[in-house]
Regions:
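A structural motif corresponding to the C-terminal end of an alpha-helix
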Residues: 188-190
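Short, glycine-/aromatic-enriched active-site segment of Class I SAM-dependent methyltransferases
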Residues: 153-173
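A short His-aromatic
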Residues: 128-129
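Hydrophobic C-terminal alpha-helix "anchor/cap" residues
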Residues: 51, 185-186
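Conserved N-terminal segment of class I S-adenosyl-L-methionine
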Residues: 1-121, 132-139, 144, 172-180, ...
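Short glycine-dipeptide loop
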Residues: 145-151
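Short catalytic micro-motifs in class I SAM-dependent methyltransferases
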Residues: 124-125
Length: 221
């Protein structure tokens, strides 16, 4: 037993579920830049609060889905997609009976999900999509939503790229300003609400001084 009895529950959780493992991507972050994991988790909490109470939610471009459990805590059911089978295998290998999610390997741009969801979100995804396919991606996201659904997108700002790592810059093929992303999203959603983050701090400040951009979209067109 633990010295303080209230911590005895931790031993019971460990016995029932085992010791939790980081995913392929989150594990790499924890090794190379531990503070970044806290920043990533805060982005997922924002999404969770925006989609709180939704029945069925879809994440596009989930990576290892380690942080996706935060969103799962706020909704009834979570489906996560990625086009890389390595990440989907990693998710399934770490499956947790208490926090089950449906993990699917598919290219979202080429293959519509086939379902309508109450919420759709994508964090750190749209900057990886070529500008020529951007409208198709948002069109797919809109089609995947119910009429009263909410979409949330998060992406690093164009202005932040001078501080991005070499690894990040290699994959970032479509970074924009807050205003440019808003204009792109308004082609597909009637209402686009803009938020910003600097590290884990959420705000509605000047877009050009924001490291990370978040868009909450309502009213699909």
């Amino acid at each position: 037993m633990t010295v303080e009895k209230q911590y005895g529950r931790l031993l019971k959780i460990d016995e029932e579920f085992g010791r939790e493992k980081l995913g392929l991507m989150s594990g790499g972050v924890w090794q190379e830049d531990p503070k970044r994991l806290g920043i990533v988790l805060s982005r997922y909490k924002f999404v969770g609060k925006m989609l709180q109470g939704k029945s069925h939610v879809l994440e596009v471009g989930c990576g290892d889905a380690f942080a996706s459990r935060i969103v799962a805590q706020f909704c009834d059911s979570l489906t996560v997609l990625d086009f890389d089978q390595i990440f989907i295998d990693d998710i399934n290998n770490r499956e947790n009976a208490r926090w089950k999610m449906n993990a699917i390997c598919t290219d979202f741009i080429k293959n519509k999900s086939g379902e309508e969801y109450d919420g759709v979100y994508a964090l750190d995804v749209i900057e990886h999509i070529n500008a020529s396919e951007e409208d198709l991606f948002f069109c797919q996201a809109s089609k995947s939503l119910k009429s009263d659904g909410i979409a949330v997108f998060g992406t690093p700002s164009l202005e932040s790229q001078v501080y991005a790592s070499i690894q990040s810059r290699e994959g970032h093929v479509n970074c924009k300003t807050q205003e440019d992303w808003k204009n792109s999203l308004r082609k597909h959603f009637a209402n686009v609400l803009c938020f910003s983050m600097n590290d884990e701090v959420l705000h509605t400040g000047f877009g050009a001084m924001s490291h990370y951009l978040l868009f909450v979209c309502v009213g699909k067109l």
